[in-house]
């Protein structure tokens, strides 16, 4: 007996209806990116591991899918190394490539490699899949699409403002109510300074970024495990639990971080971004959230995250400023900021809230019934005119029984069927049937087109 086929955990197949929904998401995001002057690029699915490793922190590096070298990859490995059973060390010997973890690091690599061809500031967008060796669960997949927009070659905070406008516009078009959360890595660095743990900034941010998932008690336990003193943890509590309006939070931070030049710079940047956005009249809520600490090594300024308000799911968009990212590829002094829409989670949110527009998921609008070669030839001439008018139409390929053809149309949710028999051909017309109401009318091809366009 043949083995039952399956797909890897954390991956999915998509039906035609699901693909129509996904394309609605991609096209909506793409249209908004174009409105703001972004241009599209693509990069390979696989990158050199030297490009990927060390860019996402220790936790991120563990989630990289590594690609085994072809050929006799054991030839350069000693018996001693094999017997050591050190998986990380062995992997470095026979894996030189990996699947991309996100689109930001490959983009930084692209900028460095193509610097002489790029006009700066460079506004690029990219819609491609990424892979993470994560534990699959609701809303978390091992293969998923990201829809990134980044600006490199400009320090201006107007870039952050525009990216938040893009987020607001996209989710307004989707009719998804969201909260846009913003923080600044400099504020987090300032907090680490004033509690006397400046050298533990990465440990602190990785821990407090988990606050929503594991709770305050477990965050504090993790901080203690990392060697952060009880006194420092106590000082941290009122800061990360700070409440009030954005203006009130900023006022408190100005007082708390007064002794930290880095922290005050972060407050200044956040104040500019939030103040400018306030004059733009965003449709969605924006919140300064000090627990937002996106545990990635490359963010250096503003950081963003977007949560859906009407459904329980993780972050559906995130991003931030990464001033030093291209430096690791030999191109210093290039500042960048970007956002990434999680298309797969947005897909789930739109499904749960039933927010897909009917026209976005409709496929064939009109099907011609096939009674035989002569009728099919007549229908094909009408079909050409219908398609030229931009109507999605098809003809049933076989002269099957009427019941089978109608069942096919119903299964595909085709709203109209055109019936062409001998009588219709004699009049040069078709019988147009509304599949929802059952109403039938004898129409010319021009009348048929007009009926479907109305």
Swiss-Prot record:
Catalyzed reactions: tRNA(His) + L-histidine + ATP = L-histidyl-tRNA(His) + AMP + diphosphate + H(+)
| Location(s), subcellular | Cytoplasm
| BP-aspect Gene Ontology terms | histidyl-tRNA aminoacylation
In the UniProt record, which is one GO cellular component term? cytoplasm
- InterPro entries from the UniProt entry: aa-tRNA-synth_II, aa-tRNA-synth_II/BPL/LPL, Anticodon-bd, Anticodon-bd_dom_sf, His-tRNA-ligase, HisRS-like_core, HisRS/HisZ, HisRS_anticodon
Look up the EC number in the record and give it. Answer: 6.1.1.21
Molecular-function GO terms, alphabetical: ATP binding; histidine-tRNA ligase activity
Broad class of where this protein is predominantly found: cytoplasm
Tell me the keywords, alphabetical order: Aminoacyl-tRNA synthetase, ATP-binding, Cytoplasm, Ligase, Nucleotide-binding, Protein biosynthesis
**Organism superkingdom:** Bacteria
Q: Give the stretches traversing the membrane.
A: none
Q: Record's SUPFAM superfamilies? A: Class II aaRS ABD-related, Class II aaRS and biotin synthetases
Please give the subunit comment from the record. Homodimer.
Q: Which family does it belong to?
A: Belongs to the class-II aminoacyl-tRNA synthetase family.
Its protein name is Histidine--tRNA ligase
Q: Which organism is it from?
A: Bacteroides thetaiotaomicron (strain ATCC 29148 / DSM 2079 / JCM 5827 / CCUG 10774 / NCTC 10582 / VPI-5482 / E50)
Source species taxonomy = Bacteria, Pseudomonadati, Bacteroidota, Bacteroidia, Bacteroidales
